[in-house]
Curated annotation (Swiss-Prot):
Keywords of the record: Cell cycle, Cell division
Family per record: Belongs to the MinE family.
Organism of derivation: Citrobacter koseri (strain ATCC BAA-895 / CDC 4225-83 / SGSC4696)
Gene: minE
Matching Gene3D superfamilies: Cell division topological specificity factor MinE (3.30.1070.10)
Name under which the protein is recorded: Cell division topological specificity factor
Length: 88
């Protein structure tokens, strides 16, 4: 019976193959998106708040968003503060 199924089985249509490949590509792109659209504005807002209290160079603030397991997001904020001035 397996031999009969082998000869009578239909090949996948090229449309189905193309659809599967496209689904794989879309899933990969969703996983590898570099950053969400709101991240630059978030960085700017955080920088403005920090500048209210400490004079820093904008390049000293980095904001990164990391995706883990599809449903977990980690926001990492690194701020390099200037060295404290010596009090006299």
């Amino acid at each position: 019976m397996a031999l009969l199924d082998f000869f009578l089985s239909r090949k996948k249509s090229t449309a189905n193959i193309a659809k599967e490949r496209l689904q794989i590509i879309v899933a990969e792109r969703r996983r590898s998106d570099a950053e969400p659209h709101y991240l630059p504005q978030l960085r700017k807002d955080i920088l403005e708040v920090i500048c209210k209290y400490v004079q820093i160079d904008p390049e000293m603030v980095t904001v990164q968003l990391e995706q883990k397991d599809g449903d977990i997001s980690i926001l990492e904020l690194n701020v390099t503060l200037p060295e404290a001035e010596e009090s006299r």
